[in-house]
């Protein structure tokens, strides 16, 4: 099992699609940083002499995980499921297409192969999302003052009392931001793992890679209607829950619940594939 996991991890992190995903992510981070630096520079003097002080220039309302307005942030959070799947989400399909699976299964059981594959897909997807976001956090700290935003300002509306770890945001914002970077890792991993569901069925590599984005776009269309029908004023779309600056409140429990649910779906798909292989 250990050798199988190491092999899959090596393949996941040593391919051009991983490099391409990170390149796109870092280009969007640079775009976010440039726009943020210009905005903070233009507003710095006026905020310094206003009753609101430096709240609008604070790191904790301007880094990519929370600002929701820069071109880099908007594009990143519009395509993040695709970026997560780019590094290795397509690998199960590619192994089947090239008949590499048959070669591998002469040396290891299918259960070990599939477990290693899912682990590599999860980790590579998580890194593809979390690494650019974390880099943006620390790079933004070089241009934005790390002052603690005050409660009930329009610029902190995304972090109301019901939002993700809201109390921590207003007391220990650095810890809140770092925890969110970890959550981003899990979002990326969960999204990439959804490719396992269609890896044996879809006959085109692009559509396998696009599966998480297409699924999340569908859920983004359906979940607002569900929320309205249930009179829930919370964000249900996983596409938007990956961004702290979502339109509706995103409580901690709904974020964790959706991560667990999507992980369960991916694991269930893996168990089904193992069962089908044993039957056949």
Regions found by a protein language model. Give the residues of each.
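Secretory targeting signals
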Residues: 28-90, 119-196, 237-259
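Central hydrophobic cores of alpha-helical transmembrane segments
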Residues: 21-28, 205-219
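Helix-loop-helix units of permease transmembrane domains in multi-pass membrane transporters
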Residues: 90-124
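Aromatic- and glycine-rich beta-strand/loop motifs that create alpha-glucan
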Residues: 1-25
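Juxtamembrane helix-break-helix junctions at the cytosolic face
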Residues: 21, 192-205
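Membrane-helix interface segments
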Residues: 17-18, 109-111, 115, 204-209
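Junction motif at the cytosolic side of a transmembrane helix
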Residues: 197, 201, 258-280
């Amino acid at each position: 099992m250990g050798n199988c996991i190491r092999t899959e991890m090596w393949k996941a992190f040593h391919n051009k699609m991983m490099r391409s995903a990170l390149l796109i992510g870092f280009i969007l981070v640079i775009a976010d940083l440039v726009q943020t630096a210009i905005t903070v520079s233009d507003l710095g003097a006026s905020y310094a002499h206003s009753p609101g002080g430096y709240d609008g220039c604070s790191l904790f309302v301007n880094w990519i995980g929370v600002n929701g307005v820069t071109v880099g942030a908007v594009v990143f959070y519009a395509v993040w499921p695709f970026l997560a799947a780019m590094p290795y989400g397509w690998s199960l399909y590619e192994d089947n297409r090239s008949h590499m699976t048959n070669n591998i299964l002469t040396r290891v059981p299918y259960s070990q192969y599939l477990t290693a594959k899912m682990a590599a897909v999860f980790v590579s997807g998580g890194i593809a999302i979390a690494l650019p976001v974390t880099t943006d956090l620390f790079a933004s700290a070089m241009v934005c003052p790390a002052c603690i935003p005050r409660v009930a300002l329009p610029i902190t509306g995304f972090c109301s009392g019901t939002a993700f770890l809201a109390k921590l945001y207003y007391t220990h914002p650095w810890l809140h931001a770092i925890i969110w970077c970890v959550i981003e890792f899990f979002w990326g991993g969960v999204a990439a793992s959804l490719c396992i569901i269609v890896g044996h069925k879809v006959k085109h590599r692009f559509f396998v890679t696009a599966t998480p984005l297409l699924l999340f776009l569908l859920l983004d269309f359906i979940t607002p209607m569900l929320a309205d029908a249930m009179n829930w004023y919370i964000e249900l779309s996983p596409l938007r829950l990956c961004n702290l600056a979502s339109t509706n409140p995103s409580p901690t429990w709904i974020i964790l619940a959706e991560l667990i649910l999507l992980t369960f779906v991916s694991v269930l798909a893996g168990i089904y594939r193992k069962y089908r292989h044993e039957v056949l």
